[in-house]
């Protein structure tokens, strides 16, 4: 079958801050059915006020809110830590050039510390 050729199940993860458990419950059904490793190929949230509720809305305008971005990452990691089948994350946005950072970038913002703390927990 097609699933026999699949090595990893991946998805993007731009879920509202308070909806992670619901989304993970939904994803878990597929992961358990096909017995494949899972990772978020892309996940992120802008540092714009209100973005934690609509992290997939890259057109959102507003005031910068670094704390909200950090809170979103904290919520994502807290929810995913309870699911041993979540194997990793591709963080959006982590640019090679730090000039002109996008609102999704975490470099030099509190969210970077949240990410470092999370990966410091992992073996």
Enumerate the predicted regions with their spans.
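Short, surface-exposed, polar/charged, turn-prone segments marking secondary-structure boundaries
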Residues: 18-19, 37-40, 66-68, 116-119
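Aromatic- and acid-rich polysaccharide-binding/catalytic face
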Residues: 1-22, 26-28, 36-37, 41-49, ...
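C-terminal beta-sandwich/jelly-roll accessory domains of carbohydrate-active enzymes
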Residues: 61-63
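Alpha-helix C-terminal capping segments
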Residues: 30-34, 80
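Aromatic-rich peripheral "rim/lid" segments of glycoside hydrolase catalytic domains that contact
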Residues: 50, 55-58, 67-72, 79-123
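A general structural detector for well-ordered alpha-helical segments in enzyme core domains, enriched
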Residues: 2-5, 23-30, 72, 76, ...
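A short helix->loop->beta-strand "cap" motif at the edges of active sites that frequently abuts
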Residues: 34-36, 86
